[in-house]
């Protein structure tokens, strides 16, 4: 009989302390039950216990079961983190602190030398103070390398579940994957066609890319295309220009591919799949303009030559001087001796198509009104100036200034305008760094084996591709078709070299 008394006393206490709640018109019994339930612990194994456990894990920052598998094992997420390490935010770091190592443990850059975890949102300052003491510098680097694991929050999964090492390495032990990726890069680059950059013969000699090696690579690509399905071959129709094929083959060996992220914008952009560097080809001399110069070099006369037949109208006209043909500039300050011959009224030479799309002021300007005045030269460093042609006095001081601006703004005819497939990578990219052997990687080593010859990644890939082709090549194979075509292209390269030496 004591139970009803206790219940009445409890009700009186509730009404006294929570009078406002009890008198509320909405759900008075439900409010009382809610207050009672808040003071009672749920049974073990019940639904409430599971919800409470999940809530506490969420509050404490504990990862869910699917989170490590989505973040740490996703190759796309890995390289999205690598892409945040720009040259302005992450520079001057040793190889053990490369973006590939930082992204392995879930770090991204938010400011200069400032890292942030993509999961627990922890911050890590990775600045390296200038020090003349080499031991202190190495100690600081070792501390930062250790902090990549220890600077995370308590319940973060990255220290225990980093991304695989293979994400930041070239698959040298898997020739089939190398050949497949090599073909994919080649096909993507062929879509750029004549927008591919021109290659300097000296760079090809330095890379030891001979005609025979290029021929073997082209045969390998042809064989792999034959092995693809009929549907794949119909959707990947390639051009017939052998010069495009040779250039795309060399670029793909060095790890470059056509950037697909900006394909709807129709930009001539190539990217590296490892260091995520994107290069706009409008800053380099392209095959299209080089072919125009080469064709014009065999038909030079004393008078200006009109536009080539069969070429698009957007290509530049051919000037009357061989030196002007190579410089493709409106400013004759580099060669004062030829200035008098070029003061006569004539067609103004416009830039190539790539420059037309890169600067709003790169357009043909009116002819000079008198021999004492000339049109202001167009440079990339001018920005968006007055669209109308400005007439300025042809003073020696201004001519010298314009010459420096033209030469320092990646003109398409200077020595810097040729695309170097190896130097355009970032210094920590696996394509240009010395590759590690499989045993060295398993032992956690970072130094190359002294007994093995040190070679960059692209050269190791080239060796594997050539060995793969030679091992699968029959004893009697007619290799005259593509070999002869590649020799024709290299003759064109040598002709360019002779033109550049004029």
From Swiss-Prot:
Motif (Nuclear localization signal): 396-402
Coiled-coil portions: none
Biased composition regions of type Polar residues, renumbered to the chain: 50-72, 351-360
Pfam families in the record: NuBaID_C (PF08600), zf-C3HC (PF07967)
Residues with the Phosphothreonine modification: 28, 84, 333, 384
Residues with N-acetylalanine modification: 2
Top-level taxon in the UniProt lineage: Eukaryota
Region (Disordered): 35-74, 302-423
Key words of the record: Acetylation, Cell cycle, Cell division, Metal-binding, Mitosis, Nucleus, Phosphoprotein, Ubl conjugation pathway, Zinc, Zinc-finger
Modified residues (Phosphoserine): 24, 58, 62, 321, 329, 338, 344, 354, 359, 370, 381, 395, 407, 483
GO cellular component terms listed in the entry, alphabetical order: nuclear envelope
Zn finger (C3HC-type) start-end: 102-156
Alphabetized GO MF terms: zinc ion binding
Post-translational modification: Phosphorylated. May also be weakly phosphorylated on Tyr residues.
InterPro entries: NuBaID_C (IPR013909), NuBaID_N (IPR012935)
Main location: nucleus
Paired cysteines (S-S): none
A Gene Ontology BP annotation from the UniProt entry: cell division
Protein location: Nucleus; Nucleus envelope
Biased composition (Low complexity): 371-380, 407-422
Function per UniProt: Required for proper positioning of a substantial amount of TPR at the nuclear basket (NB) through interaction with TPR.
Complex formation: Interacts with TPR; this interaction mediates ZC3HC1 nuclear envelopes (NE)-association but also required for proper positioning of a substantial amount of TPR at the nuclear basket (NB).
Name used for this protein in its record: Zinc finger C3HC-type protein 1
Lineage: Eukaryota, Metazoa, Chordata, Craniata, Vertebrata
